[in-house]
Amino acid sequence: MDKANPTVSVIVPNYNYARYLEARLQSILNQSFQDFELILLDDASTDNSAEVLDKYRNDFHVSHIVVNEKNTGSPFRQWMKGILLAKGEWVWIAEADDLCEPDFLETCVKQVNQYSNVAVCMVASRFIDEDGDMLQGHADYWASKKPNVSACFFPGKAYAAHNMYWNNCIINASGVLFRRSYAVKLYDSVFLNMRYSGDWVFWFQMLLQGNMVEVYRELNYFRQHTSKVSVEGINSGKRIKEDIDTYVLMENTFPDIGIYKRRLAHGQLYRKIKKVKNVEKQAELSQYLYEKLGGKASDLRLFHINKYLRWVCPWIITLKRDRLKK
């Protein structure tokens, strides 16, 4: 490996995951593809994470260990800190609590070199619990009907307008290899000021710059925790607000998105709002949705009606029908 010009920069952003760090770092260091630098970031953990990271200070792959004195409160600011430190053509944000197969990097690097102007390469993932045991179900939208090919290439802007519009189908950064030169351009993007939906915005903006490759092999293991930040975000309404802001960005980017498709998406947002337990918070979010996107209760009714219309109208748009797939 040329430490000055590695092919891949592996960024491990950590906060209070000392108990998972050694297994995670070994899963990276044991990769069959070894042309990478390792950037270790800690966001002022209160456990012994800094001590664990320090054990790897003299490892040949480790180029940076940065321990914050004060917590940033933003995983996405840590992402960008690592991206700006990175020297590789490609970046892998290997979340500190996840795991991977030994040929994750080898497979992804092969795929991104096979196609033109790739911005993002995503593998299939499985869920694991806090103890590392496999959970039921799959993490990927294609799991119920796997393609009969090993990988597929998609034009980035089309993927953003169809697949990423409905929801963030790239659910875990640990399962992605992406182009650093495109990510650096997002150094002042709005995703940095988000707490919950920043990854959705990041992947969307990456795909506006280059193309997408989906790899249909389970090479990533996405750890699920009993207490999740996303649940807190939904109950407080903050995540839903960020989702609404994300739709504003996407609809401004693609002004030709049809009204029916928009209304279905707004109906999805309204359904999330109805699940918020606090009635006053529901009213606040409904007003925010209306002000930002013109979304209203009738969009939710259309969303439910659409579920029945899809059976008698095979041409009608639905989330699954609108997605690009092979």
Task: Tell what function each PLM region has.
Residues 17-30:
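Short, well-formed alpha-helical segments that are part of the catalytic scaffolds
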Residues 68-86, 99, 107:
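Glycine-rich, basic loop-to-helix element that forms the pyrophosphate-binding segment
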Residues 27, 42-51, 70-72, 95:
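A conserved acidic beta->alpha catalytic loop
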Residues 142-239, 243:
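Conserved nucleotide-sugar donor-binding catalytic segment
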Residues 5-8, 29-40, 48, 60-64:
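Short loop->beta transition adjacent to catalytic acidic/histidine clusters or analogous donor-positioning motifs
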Residues 103-143:
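Conserved donor NDP-sugar-binding/catalytic core segment of glycosyltransferases
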Residues 91:
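Short aromatic/hydrophobic "clamp" motif used to bind/position activated sugar donors
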Residues 1, 252, 269-326:
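Membrane-interface aromatic/basic loop that binds lipid-linked glycans or pyrophosphate carriers
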